[in-house]
Amino acid sequence: MKVRRRRHTLLPQALLLPAVALFLLFTVAPGGYAIYLSFMKQKAGGGLFGTDNPTTVFAGLENYRAAFGDAEFWHSIGRMLLVAVVGVPATIILSTTFALCLDAKRARLVGFSRLAIFLPYAVPGVVATLLWGFMYLPATSPIGGNTVNYFGSHMVFFSVANVAVWGVLGFNMVVIYTSLRGLPRELFQAAELDGASELQIALRVKLPMLAPTLTLVTVFSLIGALQLFNEPTTLKPVTNAISSTWVPLMRVYTDAFVDNDIYRGAAASFLLIVLTVAATVAANTVLRLVARRSER
Amino acid sequence: MTAATTGTASRAAAGSGGTRPGGPHRTNWIPTIILLVGAVYCVLPVVWIVIASTKTNSELFSSAPFAPSFHGGFFSNLRALFAYDHGIFTRWAVNSVIYAVGGATLSTIVCGCAGYALGKYRFYGSVWLFRVIVAAVLLPQIMLAIPQFLLLAKLGMTNNYAAVILPQLVSPFAIYLCKVYAESSVSDQVLEAARVDGASEWRSFLSIGARLMTPALVTVFLLQFIGIWNNFLLPFVMLNRDNLFPLTEGLYGLLIITGGQAAQYTIVIVGVLVSIVPLAAVFLLLQRYWRVDLVSGGVKA
């Protein structure tokens, strides 16, 4: 079978061409353009208000200095982190708990619960936020909006995180459950014969073996949290608790489209991309170390 | 089945000081109750919106939250929704379908082809290319939305269907999934046999490779469909004409317009309901075809 094992073919290159072209056009080029813009600024032109023929000139690190020196930028990052601190662990803990319960012996109503918990994934984020907005609003709230101020200065972080958790819980649960079903059953039976209780099997046998999947789910949740935009933007019209610069992406949007300073917006969005990549790499490394340690 | 085969084992465990009482047919209450609480949490807002959509505006603020109304509020709300601004809601729904079906179809083709090429062929630069694409998983697509807008605006290409569809076609995760799946499921022997039979590379890709990859392609299609249907930021920055809006944008616009006046809440509520129902139906119908194990399987590789 050594006869011309690989014929000369350009098929793989042809198959890759659309993906590579689109990747260059819509990922690499915009990224590069944003970096370019972040080092530029608008120079006032002639005329009464300096608006005639404005020119773009090199600004050096001015936009970055402005972003770094701006307290509101750091506040927006702080708010995003607060939502993440509430939302990410809640997502992981709840979805893992539900997955373990689905896998538990003699649990009932498993099919129904699985579908019900998965349902919010089919609800678009904006629509989910509108839904929860009505749940939070005192005028319409079925969950005690008259007694609980869901938009209070501390509560608002939980309210926003809740919407995000509600939306992704089911998807994560199914991912974890699927990988749980793929584990060798004999191990659990062996542990059972050794006298381990259902709870002990879940915590000491199943959970450690889920480590790679939990790593993936955590990294995805983290990336999701750093991109927080839909929920606060959609809640903004119904409450004063959320400003137009509440989280970094809203801030970038406001810079670029409301204040018409695309250069500052570009600098801030490039900073965010750097932060996201750094956070993802860090989370991946830490979780891998933890997983390795728990294997020993 | 598991309960039957391990029944004796669990009884043995109970006998040796295990904490679980009972035989194989007894309900395990703790996980069941936890699951039910989770189910109620996830379904509650949807149940509420179904009930709220039956109410007239005054009933919305006066009647008990979970008591449905039968005074014809539902149909008058629906009529008001579809009559709003000369029926623009229908237009938004059609737009959503165009974006999601068109985008997901094209994306499945683009990512499927790329995944197959990376999974089944080794050529100069292929390993390197794959690494770059996998690294792009770290790049949040959504954060690129604003630079994408700036670039497209520079080229005068915003405010049309392509501006929303094109940036979403390449999904690093989908390419990764297709590559891993092609490697494991499209066997070299079968391809070799086709070659010996004189099939061209193109032909063996179309009639063997593509067919064997169907489960991965269906999964990619559904992931992309939901992703595009739910995307908010990209249309939000790319479009400023409301006849191009997808449902999400449209409903958000409705909320802003009606934000100050509670009198319009019923339109938004029934709009939310109408936008959930079709997707939830498609979703429940197709849920056994799409393979989440492919999604989680990626980490084991």
Give each language-model segment a name.
Chain A
Residues H8-R296:
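A structural signal for multi-pass alpha-helical bundles of membrane permease subunits
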Residues M1-R7:
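Short, Lys/Arg-rich, polar N-terminal cytosolic tail immediately upstream
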